[in-house]
């Protein structure tokens, strides 16, 4: 099985890249986000690989990190999610945002993925909530906020600040992560306006 490829970018197509490794061109399917991040043809690149072997074909899927590859595998444990949908999800949400969306059960963030409807998005955030392994880069503050929001225990300034950032167009995972960081910086007695201001600074980094 192929676990990693390191070579030169030969060419791109809509959903895959040809990676030249020692004169052999490997067709590697990638998410849109990964393809956009890869260098120009002729430059070097390294991809973590997931190899699918079937009776009639061998298919390679490429990722910028082992963490992204693990998410690709985990997503496919959800009913109705195959390789194509898993790649699409990772093309819409980078691993950290996906982890936060699952922690917050933010199915709307997942449903922004082309080809993912509300039912599949609901299954992803529900079935993976307790499966997200140690590699998931979830902000601890987001995890605490998730429980507080679900139980209606979140302090009103924090809840209002998250709502304000969402109204400004930010996704719930982004807003929650930013306000979690703002709350750590400002302390427990911070007011809504201060949290919003600090949250916007976090989002601008």
Curated annotation (Swiss-Prot):
GO cellular component assignments: cytoplasm; Holliday junction helicase complex; Holliday junction resolvase complex
Subcellular location: Cytoplasm
Major subcellular site: cytoplasm
Region of interest (Domain I), residue spans: 1-64
Keyword DNA damage set for record: yes
Matching SUPFAM superfamilies: DNA helicase RuvA subunit, C-terminal domain (SSF46929), Nucleic acid-binding proteins (SSF50249), RuvA domain 2-like (SSF47781)
Annotated region described as Domain II, given as residue ranges: 65-143
Keyword Cytoplasm recorded: yes
Stretches the record annotates as Domain III: 154-205
Pfam families, A to Z: HHH_5, RuvA_C, RuvA_N
Keywords for this protein: Cytoplasm, DNA damage, DNA recombination, DNA repair, DNA-binding
GO molecular-function terms, A-Z: ATP binding; four-way junction DNA binding; four-way junction helicase activity
Region listing for Flexible linker, in residue ranges: 144-154
Tree of life domain: Bacteria
InterPro entries noted in UniProt: DNA_helicase_Holl-junc_RuvA_I, Hlx-hairpin-Hlx_DNA-bd_motif, NA-bd_OB-fold, RuvA, RuvA_2-like, RuvA_C, RuvA_C_sf
Complex and partners: Homotetramer. Forms an RuvA(8)-RuvB(12)-Holliday junction (HJ) complex. HJ DNA is sandwiched between 2 RuvA tetramers; dsDNA enters through RuvA and exits via RuvB. An RuvB hexamer assembles on each DNA strand where it exits the tetramer. Each RuvB hexamer is contacted by two RuvA subunits (via domain III) on 2 adjacent RuvB subunits; this complex drives branch migration. In the full resolvosome a probable DNA-RuvA(4)-RuvB(12)-RuvC(2) complex forms which resolves the HJ.
Domain notes: Has three domains with a flexible linker between the domains II and III and assumes an 'L' shape. Domain III is highly mobile and contacts RuvB.
Family note: Belongs to the RuvA family.
NCBIfam families cross-referenced by the UniProt entry: ruvA
Name this polypeptide is given: Holliday junction branch migration complex subunit RuvA
Organism classification: Bacteria, Pseudomonadati, Pseudomonadota, Alphaproteobacteria, Hyphomicrobiales
């Amino acid at each position: 099985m192929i676990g990693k490829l390191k070579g030169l970018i030969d060419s791109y197509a809509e959903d895959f890249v040809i990676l030249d490794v020692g004169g052999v061109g490997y067709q590697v399917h990638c998410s849109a986000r990964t393809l956009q991040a890869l260098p120009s043809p002729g430059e070097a690149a390294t991809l973590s690989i997931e190899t699918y072997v079937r009776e009639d074909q061998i298919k390679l899927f490429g990722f910028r990190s082992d963490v992204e590859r693990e998410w690709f595998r985990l997503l496919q444990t959800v009913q109705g999610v195959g390789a194509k949908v898993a790649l699409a999800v990772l093309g819409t949400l980078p691993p950290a945002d996906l982890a936060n969306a699952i922690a917050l059960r933010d199915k709307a963030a997942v449903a922004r993925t082309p080809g993912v409807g509300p039912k599949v998005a609901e299954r992803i955030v529900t079935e993976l909530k307790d499966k997200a392994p140690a590699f998931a880069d979830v902000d601890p503050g987001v995890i605490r906020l998730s429980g507080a929001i679900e139980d209606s225990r979140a302090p009103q300034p924090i809840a209002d600040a998250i709502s304000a950032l969402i109204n400004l167009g930010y996704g719930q995972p982004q807003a929650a992560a930013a306000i979690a960081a703002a709350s750590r910086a400002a302390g427990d007695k911070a007011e809504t306006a201060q949290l919003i201001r600090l949250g916007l600074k976090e989002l601008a980094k």
